[in-house]
From Swiss-Prot:
Oligomeric and partner information: Interacts (via KH domains) with ANKS6 (via SAM domain) in an RNA-dependent manner. Interacts with ANKS3.
Gene this chain is encoded by: BICC1
High-level lineage: Eukaryota, Metazoa, Chordata, Craniata, Vertebrata
Compositionally biased intervals (Basic and acidic residues): 690-703
PROSITE patterns noted in UniProt: KH_TYPE_1, SAM_DOMAIN
Alphabetized GO MF terms: RNA binding
Biased composition (Polar residues): 602-619
Protein name, as recorded: Protein bicaudal C homolog 1
First-listed, main subcellular location of the protein, grouped into a coarse class: cytoplasm
Pfam families, per the entry: KH_1, KH_BICC1, KH_BICC1_1st, SAM_1
Gene source species: Homo sapiens (Human)
Domain SAM: start-end pairs: 873-936
Sorted UniProt keywords: Acetylation, Cytoplasm, Developmental protein, Disease variant, Phosphoprotein, Repeat, RNA-binding
Domain of life: Eukaryota
Subcellular location: Cytoplasm
Modified-residue entries (N6-acetyllysine), positions: K398
Length: 974
């Protein structure tokens, strides 16, 4: 290093053999070099190679020599020259600590083999590129200053701690029109990933909400008031108020940091409660993300599937701007509850594009098929191109942030390294990053098939729905510690959804398997639609879901927090309470949830322990996953005893089907607080004491397997006790009384005393079912009614989520009796022709639910005088008739139009359509009833049993009060 102080220090710049690029960092050829080069210039075996070495390592070598702590550069290169018989030119006058970060060049001359050997010896000590990567991430330009910090303090600290160089775009200083969001991080893989996480934690978190207008003279709250200052200091947030122009009221802005997310959420909730009081729960919270417009389509996915999935999962609304709007064209708005907005924000950030770049040695050849397999299994895009004028290849790996670990895993596989160099420890803490982002094995989007394929980056053929009967062994070949794909049982194919990451599977989860879902990979769009169609889209409603409408995983997690320590059993990852679709073996989850909740930690469903269901398709299980998207509505009392009894019979098909309901469909409304989480006619048949715990308003989607498969299972069921039938009849009587009570005009002189007569029966027209229905109707969200109105087919199909009409026999479990386990399937003498619309039954089995629909009743109970409906109908008005026919949900429609029974008997099919009865099955029921009643009315005066007491409504609407002892209803559809 003495050369630095000599007058010849800058002489290299004017050396005839140097150029402007070399400066002091380039090799300075000595006289000996020139002589040797000149003597052998024309030798055919002579070659010369120029390559870069790591500047920091060379500086460290020179520094150590100057301090007498190691050998000098001169000694190092001289030794190599002697051993390889080559000439080496190197920048001996390299300035230590210079501003330039460029790596200096080394030039080696000699025979080809000698040059190659010398280069390997030099690079073994001074090489950096083989383990150096560059990561380009997307950070909103509006937040660059916040990340950099005052005087660059924030980013300097990150660079020092991670050993990386972080570069923010210089073009943003001068270009006001187009701002770049790209931030580059260069360094070792572990440091680069750590820096990425740290940058995300430095991002600001801003939540906003509108203060309700209490009055014209209401002043804007003072942010300096003691209470607000106390909240601000306690939770380390800043609070400001913005007056809305031309309107009364104000917008509250809460600012915090991403690494303080939990405190920001708590502080915002406290502030809401302080400022809005009882209205706090009804006020939506909003935030916004600045995402480059060119990434919007990529993030939304095909047909918006990605965003829909996030909205349904979190319950937040997400609004992307109109691309034609020049102002704020990059701002994405999120609205919902505090929790849902923060979670949706994290999921969106997890969808931001990420690019990893690194060099590969020129001699390394990679099979294109291997690259294709890596791209599919790791959900990444890989591009390899040769570098001009350099003996190496440039590799570019693209993916999204939630899949970051897999990008390093792809690098490990391509370079043949033993480790990716990145550990899960570099992931953000659970407080700052929700499960599913930094730990992609818990990724909700990938688990629903919404990886890069869903985002539109990869082709449709790469969707990882493996329909072969043998597991894909690629991951095992890459890493022996990786959990294998689930092995199919009994030769049954076991398709899998998107594979979890290699880097994480050894310590987290394995592959999820969904039994009996045989859909080819080309049907991805269809699969996505099915997955999403039946799940209520909370994202479309501004208010947060009512208390009973929280997703089922929230209730499961509430059980986990009761000291049972089963989060690992549910999730396969100890730090994450998030449950992903399809991540848990569907045949045994419910049982394991119960076992774990009862303090039995021996049963867990970690990914490495998952097994396929052991049941045979002949047991009626083929429909187990068909209704993955159908809404469900279990109660949420947390009564694990009842739940255990219901889910633990020996019937695998029922347990599996109900578990799928629990995982996939329970985002429908929990309309009534009752004691059962799941219910099924088959299970209830063996549980008479529990059969009546479920409120009638809690809907169940109909699930009946094929007749041949069900008969053998139902044959041994115990007969129903008569008191259960009487209870069912009593319920219907109460329903009629409730309808009449609501229609009755209040009498001023009458004292009305509240009672609990209707408690728990779900008859209210105001809370909660009707309110939820009106709320969803206002937001164009489909509402699945309590009362079904169509003829249901006994077989199930994928179209059930869109179409509820199936002509034919077999009633679905949406009706009250089926849900309470007293449907036709509970009779001991159940006929073999369950699927037939005209099944015959013995007189002993003709109880209150002996018919599954109107046609069954007509065919099986019509007497010689044809007065069956006449005899069963002893009511006095239209609501009672509709209740008998299972059409109670349409009562309000006719009451609003002031249509009484007499007018109803004159209606035609076209009239019913105009009234809004669009469902074919319901109209057919009504028309058959009209026809039957009119026919009975004509026969009334000819009948010897005609009585003198008639119903109200005029001569044309008179019906006798004759009651048939064997019939409580014309229809089993309540």
């Amino acid at each position: 290093m003495a050369a630095q102080g000599e007058p010849g220090y800058l002489a290299a710049q004017s050396d005839p053999g140097s150029n402007s690029e070399r400066s002091t960092d380039s090799p300075v050829p000595g006289s000996e070099d020139d002589l040797v080069a000149g003597a052998t210039l024309h030798s055919p075996e002579w070659s010369e190679e120029r390559f870069r070495v790591d500047r920091k390592k060379l500086e460290a070598m020179l520094q150590a020599a100057a301090e007498g702590k190691g050998r000098s550069g001169e000694d190092f290169f001289q030794k190599i020259m002697e051993e390889t018989n080559t000439q080496i030119a190197w920048p001996s006058k390299l300035k230590i600590g210079a501003k330039s970060k460029k790596d200096p060049h080394i030039k080696v001359s000699g025979k080809k083999e000698d040059v190659k050997e010398a280069k390997e010896m030099i690079m073994s000590v001074l090489d950096t590129k083989s383990n150096r990567v560059t990561l380009k991430m997307d950070v909103s330009h509006t937040e660059h200053s916040h990340v950099i910090g005052k005087g660059g303090n924030n980013i300097k600290k990150v660079m020092e701690e991670t050993g990386c160089h972080i570069h923010f775009p210089d073009s943003n200083r001068n270009n006001q029109a187009e701002k770049s969001n790209q931030v580059s991080i260069a360094g070792q893989p572990a440091g680069v990933e750590s820096a990425r996480v740290r940058i995300r934690e430095l991002l600001p978190l801003v939540l906003m909400f509108e203060l309700p207008i209490a009055g014209i003279l209401q002043p804007v709250p003072d942010p300096n008031s003691p209470s607000i200052q106390h909240i601000s200091q306690t939770y380390n947030i800043s609070v400001s108020f913005k007056q809305r122009s031309r309107m009364y009221g104000a917008t509250v802005i809460v600012r915090g940091s991403q690494n303080n997310t939990s405190a920001v959420k708590e502080g915002t909730a406290m502030l809401l409660e302080h400022l809005a009081g009882s209205l706090a729960s009804a006020i939506p919270v909003s935030t916004q993300l600045d995402i480059a417009a060119q990434h919007h389509l990529f993030m939304m996915g095909r047909n918006g599937s990605n965003i829909k999935h996030i909205m349904q999962r979190t319950g937040a609304q997400i609004h992307f701007p109109d691309p034609s709007n020049p102002q704020k064209k990059s701002t994405v708005y999120l609205q919902g509850t505090i929790e849902s907005v923060c979670l949706a924000r994290q999921y969106l950030m997890g969808c931001l594009p990420l690019v990893l770049m690194f060099d590969m040695k020129e001699e390394i050849e990679v099979d294109p098929q291997f690259i294709a397999q890596l791209m599919e299994q790791l959900d990444v895009f890989i591009s390899i191109k040769p570098k001009p004028k350099q003996p190496s290849k440039s590799v570019i790996v693209k993916s999204v942030e939630r899949n970051a670990l897999n990008m390093y895993e792809a690098r490990k596989c391509l370079l043949g390294l033993e480790s990716s160099g990145v550990t899960i420890a570099t992931s953000p803490s659970p407080a700052s990053c929700p499960a599913g982002l930094a730990c992609p094995s818990l990724d909700i989007l990938a688990s629903a098939g919404l990886g890069l394929t869903g985002l539109g980056l990869l082709g449709p053929t790469t969707l990882s729905l493996n329909t072969s009967t043998t597991p894909n062994s690629l991951l095992n070949a890459l890493n022996s510690s990786v959990s294998p794909l689930q092995s199919p049982s009994s030769g049954t194919p076991s398709p899998t959804l998107w594979a979890p990451p290699l880097a994480n599977t050894s310590s987290a989860t394995g592959f999820s398997a969904i039994p009996h879902l045989m859909i080819p990979s080309t049907a991805q769009a269809t699969l996505t639609n099915i997955l999403l169609s039946g799940v209520p889209t909370y994202g479309h409603t501004a208010p947060s879901p009512p208390p009973g409408l929280t997703p089922v995983d929230v209730h499961i997690n509430s059980m986990q927090t009761e000291g049972k320590k089963i989060s690992a059993a549910l999730n396969g990852h100890a730090q994450s309470p998030d449950i992903k679709y399809g991540a848990i073996s569907t045949s045994s989850l419910g049982e394991k949830v119960l076992s774990a909740n009862h303090g039995d930690p021996s049963i867990q469903t970690s990914g490495s322990e998952q097994t396929s269901p052991k049941s045979s398709p002949t047991e009626g299980c083929n429909d187990a996953f068909v209704e993955v998207g159908m809404p469900r509505s279990p109660s949420h009392s947390g009564n694990a005893g009842d739940l255990k009894q219901m889910m633990c019979p020996s019937k695998v098909s029922c347990a599996k089907r109900q578990t799928v309901e629990l995982l996939q469909g329970t985002k429908n409304s929990h309309l009534h607080s009752t004691d059962r989480l799941l219910s099924d006619p088959e299970l209830s048949a063996t549980e008479s004491p529990l059969a009546d715990k479920k409120a009638p308003g809690s809907e169940r989607a109909a699930e009946r397997a094929a007749a041949a498969q069900q008969n053998s299972e139902r044959a041994h069921l115990a007969p129903r006790s008569s008191y259960v039938n009487m209870q069912a009849f009593d319920y219907e009587q109460k329903k009629l009384l409730a309808t009449k009570a609501m229609l009755k005009k209040p009498v001023v002189t009458e004292v009305r005393t509240p009672t609990n007569t209707w408690s728990g029966l779900g008859f209210s027209k105001s809370m909660p079912a009707e309110t939820i229905k009106e709320l969803r109707r206002a937001n164009h969200v489909s509402y699945k009614p309590t009362m079904t109105t169509t003829y249901e087919g006994s077989s199930m199909s994928l179209s059930r989520s869109n179409s509820r009409e199936h002509l034919g026999g077999g009633s679905e479990s949406d009706n009250w009796r089926d849900r309470n386990g007293i449907g036709p399937g509970s009779h001991s003498e159940f006929a073999a022709s369950i699927g037939s619309p005209k099944r015959k039954q013995n007189k002993s089995t003709e109880h209150y639910l002996s018919s599954s629909n109107y046609m069954d009743c007509i065919s099986s109970l019509t007497g010689s005088n044809g007065c069956n409906l006449n005899s069963s109908f002893k009511g006095s008005d239209l609501p009672e008739l509709f209740s008998k026919l299972g059409l109670g949900k349409y009562t309000d429609v006719f009451q609003q139009q002031e249509i009484d029974l007499q007018t109803f008997l004159t209606l035609t099919d076209q009239d019913l359509k105009e009234l809004g009865i669009t469902t074919f099955g319901a109209r057919r029921k009504m028309l058959l009833a009209i026809s039957e009643l009119n026919k009975n009315r004509r026969k009334l005066f000819e009948s010897p049993n005609a009585r003198t007491s008639f119903l109200e409504g005029g001569a044309s609407g008179r019906l006798p009060r004759q009651y048939h002892s064997d019939i409580a209803s014309v229809s089993g559809r309540w």
